[in-house]
């Protein structure tokens, strides 16, 4: 996992300044299984562990730990400041202030949660899961698929772009689903950067939305996780992070010899 804010680039275990040459600053115990995190500020993070803990880190120090006893797949901070942690068995937790509460369970594993500027919360996940939360309960939508929906992106007009495995992509708008004809691939993540929507297509490279389909923006990069700031798009793949500023793609590679650890 990777996120970006100005010159800060973060993997699940370390913070790097002056990318890609900066020294690594330890962010969390390397033995923790960090599923995902969201950066509130360059020195302020929310991390969701696969072990079921959600950890808040400020200036390298843990300020809050909540053990929610769920295998988490991700975490998301909404514009209104609420935090959503989500994962297996349809679990979604919401933090308002410092208090966590469990939302009603969904029918399958949750892989992505995003909130719209209007406060509507959307979730997608395994077995074709797609639903919205109105503050009290979920409304499920039938997209006529059982593929895993990996990511969603809420657009300014209120429509929702979704992508997933087995060439699945399209847009949900005005209570209607429109399937897109996209290149054959598995799709893992979506990000809005400098007015364009980018798509992580794994080993097939980085793609960009053009009309109602995807076109290759950069081949020969592994793009499983995307994070965007006003200045950069960070692309995480197999042992590498690529930074895109709209022109160039400098790359940082991690060549760890696991046998020596």
Where are these regions (language model features)?
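Residue-level hotspots at or immediately adjacent to binding/recognition sites across diverse folds
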Residues: 1-261
């Amino acid at each position: 996992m990777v996120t970006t804010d100005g010159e800060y680039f973060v993997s699940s275990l370390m913070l790097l300044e002056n990318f890609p040459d900066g020294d690594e600053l330890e962010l969390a115990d390397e033995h923790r299984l960090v599923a995902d995190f969201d950066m509130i500020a360059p020195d302020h993070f929310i991390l969701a562990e696969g072990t079921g803990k959600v950890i808040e880190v400020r200036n390298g120090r843990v300020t809050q730990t909540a053990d929610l006893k769920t295998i988490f797949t991700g975490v998301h901070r909404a514009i209104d400041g609420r935090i959503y942690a989500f994962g297996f068995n349809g679990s979604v937790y919401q933090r308002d202030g410092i208090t966590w509460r469990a939302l009603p369970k969904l029918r399958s594993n949750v892989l992505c949660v995003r909130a719209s500027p209007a406060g509507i919360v959307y979730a997608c996940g395994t077995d074709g899961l797609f639903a919205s939360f109105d503050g009290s309960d979920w409304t499920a939508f039938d997209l006529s698929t059982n593929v895993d929906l990996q990511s969603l992106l809420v657009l300014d007009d209120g429509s929702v772009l979704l992508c997933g495995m087995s060439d699945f992509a399209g847009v949900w708008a005005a209570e209607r689903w429109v399937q897109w004809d996209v290149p054959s691939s598995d799709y893992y993540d979506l990000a809005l950067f400098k007015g364009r929507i980018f798509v992580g297509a794994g080993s097939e490279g980085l793609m960009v939305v053009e009309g109602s389909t995807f076109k290759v923006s950069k081949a020969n990069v592994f793009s499983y996780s995307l994070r965007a700031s006003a200045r950069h798009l960070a692309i995480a793949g197999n042992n590498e992070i690529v930074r895109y500023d709209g022109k160039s793609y400098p790359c940082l590679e991690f060549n760890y010899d696991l046998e020596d650890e």
